[in-house]
């Protein structure tokens, strides 16, 4: 190799390194999450995206889902303190669905039977029953940093206007914040780069009581069906879905927890302290976005949600090409199978690695 070529290669490497150090070339993402905590699938998905050296997390928008919004905001802020990323803004979003409510679902249960899981409405974390604006004692300690005063839907709209066609929206909770953004700005969806969704259920192979007898009834879709429908009818440049069907093929077991425990980083110690054996619902959606080669099989399907107020309220509806009704539903890339060993390996690496510091563009 001639000295001229060597000099050119060195200059190229320096340029690439400089761009990476300045945050250039990173994938911009907004995390829209129902961030129950401490630990668990919501927080571990946030960690995967924040800990990746290839992402620029513009902000974390938080709405009611697995827990009430204000409680989730506090857990998110505390997580960011623990891992040394207090610079990432946390934006409070929707407290309640557009139409659905706990009272409505209690009435629905009298007609159609008990729900297995109701998120904030059945207090799955075992805390004492509390109202939507109360914060129970936090096992990890209360945060010192504060959430932004900007509303999540406004932030979502502002970011896609600031970075048109560059921002990925990662949505792993109910769709209320996105529906509000769409209602306020009809061009919002088209100005994003893509929408990555953890939600929906088609025909999963599982003995999980939540889905074994009600295979299309998935929480993120049914908690706010009207919002889900608005999102699934918006004109996203690309729509990717991690449904229950593929999620139930994964598991956060003792072996993964023990592997993560070997790392001394604050992120790893946080994960192992609060980890619970469970399906890696949101983590799969996050890691598969970071490395799409984890997914080995896809289906192209048109999707919608049942907004009729009967037994199927909130259920996922799908059609293959040619059978969709043509009422505005769009086609999505539905993940169908994965390389589990590769996913587990990359998930452990993301949980265990040191959290990247904010670049000057991110501060």
Predicted regions span which residues?
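Bacterial N-terminal signal peptides
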Residues: 7-17
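Active-site histidine-anchored catalytic micro-motif
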Residues: 24-78, 85-86, 128-241, 247
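Conformational coupling and interaction surfaces
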Residues: 25-27, 44-52, 56, 219-363
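Surface-exposed loop and adjacent secondary-structure segments within mature catalytic domains
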Residues: 88-146
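Glycine-rich beta-alpha junction loops
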Residues: 94-99, 176, 199-202, 243-252, ...
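Short, surface-exposed amphipathic charged segments that create phosphate/polyanion-binding patches used
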Residues: 104-112, 209-214, 256-258
């Amino acid at each position: 190799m001639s000295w001229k070529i060597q000099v050119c290669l060195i200059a190229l490497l320096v340029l690439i390194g400089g761009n990476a150090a300045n945050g250039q070339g990173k994938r911009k993402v907004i995390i829209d999450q129902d961030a129950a905590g401490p630990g668990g699938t919501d927080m571990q998905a946030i960690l995967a995206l924040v800990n990746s050296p290839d992402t620029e997390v513009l902000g974390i928008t938080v709405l009611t889902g697995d827990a009430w919004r204000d409680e989730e905001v506090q857990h998110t802020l505390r997580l960011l303190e623990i891992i040394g990323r207090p610079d990432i803004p946390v934006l409070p979003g929707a407290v309640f669905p557009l139409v659905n409510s706990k009272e409505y679902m209690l009435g629905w249960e009298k007609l159609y039977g008990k729900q297995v899981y109701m998120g904030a409405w059945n207090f799955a974390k075992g805390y004492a029953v509390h109202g939507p604006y109360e914060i129970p004692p936090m096992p990890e300690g209360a945060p010192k940093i504060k959430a932004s005063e900007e509303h999540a839907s406004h932030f979502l709209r502002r970011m896609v206007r600031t970075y048109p066609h560059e921002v990925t929206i990662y949505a792993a909770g109910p769709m209320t914040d996105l529906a509000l953004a769409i209602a306020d700005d009809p061009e919002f969806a088209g100005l994003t780069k893509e929408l990555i969704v953890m939600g929906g259920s088609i025909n999963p192979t599982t003995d999980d009581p939540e889905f074994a007898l009600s295979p299309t009834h998935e929480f993120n879709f049914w908690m706010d069906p009207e919002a889900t429908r608005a999102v699934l009818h918006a004109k996203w440049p690309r729509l990717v879905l991690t449904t229950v069907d593929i999620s139930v093929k994964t598991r956060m077991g003792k072996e993964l927890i023990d592997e993560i425990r070997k790392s001394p980083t604050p992120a790893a110690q946080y994960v192992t302290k609060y980890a619970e054996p469970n399906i890696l619902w949101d983590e799969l959606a996050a890691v598969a976005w970071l490395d799409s080669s984890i997914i080995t099989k896809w289906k192209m399907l048109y999707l919608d949600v049942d907004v009729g107020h009967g037994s199927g309220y909130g259920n996922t509806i799908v059609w293959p090409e040619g059978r969709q009704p043509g009422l505005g539903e769009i086609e999505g890339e539905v993940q169908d199978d994965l390389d589990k060993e590769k996913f587990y390996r990359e998930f452990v690496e993301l949980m265990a690695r040191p959290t990247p510091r904010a670049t000057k563009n991110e501060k």
